[in-house]
From Swiss-Prot:
GO terms for molecular function: heme binding; hemoglobin alpha binding; metal ion binding; oxygen binding; oxygen carrier activity; protein-containing complex binding. Residues 3-147 form the Globin domain. PANTHER family: HEMOGLOBIN FAMILY MEMBER, HEMOGLOBIN SUBUNIT EPSILON. One of its GO terms (cellular component) is hemoglobin complex. It comes from the Eukaryota. It comes from Mus musculus. Red blood cells. Heterotetramer of two alpha chains and two beta chains. This is Hemoglobin subunit beta-H1. InterPro entries: Globin, Globin-like_sf, Globin/Proto, Hemoglobin_b, Hemoglobin_oxygen_transport. Belongs to the globin family. Keywords: Heme, Iron, Metal-binding, Oxygen transport, Transport.
Amino acid sequence: MVHFTAEEKAAITSIWDKVDLEKVGGETLGRLLIVYPWTQRFFDKFGNLSSALAIMGNPRIRAHGKKVLTSLGLGVKNMDNLKETFAHLSELHCDKLHVDPENFKLLGNMLVIVLSTHFAKEFTPEVQAAWQKLVIGVANALSHKYH
C-alpha cells in the first residue's frame, strides 16, 4: 500500500485540477505508442498509427487517452486505496486484454513527462516526486491481478 503525505496529495491535486483530460490524455497515450511502438498492438482497431503525426492526430487515441486519465482521476480521489480502486481494471487488463503490466509503468512515465511540459513552472522536483509515486502506485495496483 502506498502512503501519501498531505503535502504529496496537495502537490498532485494542484496539478490534477488543471489537467485537460483529452489534451493531456491524448498526448500521453500518443507518446507511449510512438516511444514504445510495440504497445500499438493493443490499439490495432484505432485506425492509422503509421507515423507519429498520424498517432498524435488520431481522434480515437485522444478519446482513449481521455478515458485513461478519467480512470486515473479515480486514483487521484482515492490515493489511499489504489489497489481496490483499480481492481476491476486490473482484472480487465490481465484476463481479457492480456496487457503486459510493464506497460502501466511506461504509461505512467509518459504522463509525468507530459505533465512536466504542460506545467513546467509548477512541476518542481517535489511535485514530480509526488506524481511519480502516484503513477507507480497506480501501475502496481493495475498489476495486482497478475500476481
